[in-house]
């Protein structure tokens, strides 16, 4: 035997996530728990981690991105992190942010209130949440619009061009969506 090889698995250590904390997803997202991260304040460990991630892609000379989406970050619950993403895309001036303004159980009036508070040419928000099939469990789940909208933008750019709106029957169909979580009336859609 010329060479001896050993494989030793990692033991102990800490990856920053406490295994005793539940990982709240989808309709369970709250300010204190989004995907296992505490985002309740600007100094919470989850908020600090997200801001580090946002800052790491903030230089347009280092990272060529044109679309940013952070499912699980809901403006109504996580405004600090949400606003940091807006600050980053506005400073870059070459990327667009698809954000979620409300959670699954929030009303259209709450979505309008949160959406009106955003004044940026670099942000798009959508409502309501969407029902889709979970590819792992083959069951119906509710996801924020920011999960499926990047695919619509990419499809739109492939069949048309960036300056065409991802709307209508040809470019605005939501591939992967089964239904919406809250069906809006005609009057609500016009607001």
Task: Indicate where each model-derived feature is located.
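A glycine- and small-residue-enriched flexible loop/hinge signal that marks low-structured segments
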Residues: 1-191
């Amino acid at each position: 035997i010329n060479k001896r090889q050993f494989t030793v698995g990692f033991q102990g250590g800490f990856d920053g996530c406490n295994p005793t904390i539940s990982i709240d997803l989808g309709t369970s997202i709250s300010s204190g728990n989004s995907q296992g991260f505490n985002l309740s304040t600007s100094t919470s460990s989850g908020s600090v981690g997200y801001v580090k991630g946002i800052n790491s892609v903030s230089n347009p000379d280092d990272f060529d991105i044109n679309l940013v989406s952070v499912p699980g970050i809901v403006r109504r619950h996580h405004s600090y992190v949400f606003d940091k993403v807006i600050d980053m895309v506005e400073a870059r001036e070459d990327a667009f942010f698809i954000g979620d303004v409300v959670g699954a159980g929030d009303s259209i009036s709450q979505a309008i209130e949160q959406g009106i508070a955003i004044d940026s040419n670099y942000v798009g928000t959508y409502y309501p949440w969407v029902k889709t099939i979970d590819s792992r469990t083959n069951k119906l789940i509710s996801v924020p619009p920011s999960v499926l909208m990047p695919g619509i933008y990419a499809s739109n750019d492939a069949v048309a061009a960036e300056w065409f709106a991802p709307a209508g029957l040809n470019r605005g169909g939501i591939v992967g969506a089964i239904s919406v979580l809250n069906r809006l009336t005609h009057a609500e859609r016009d607001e």
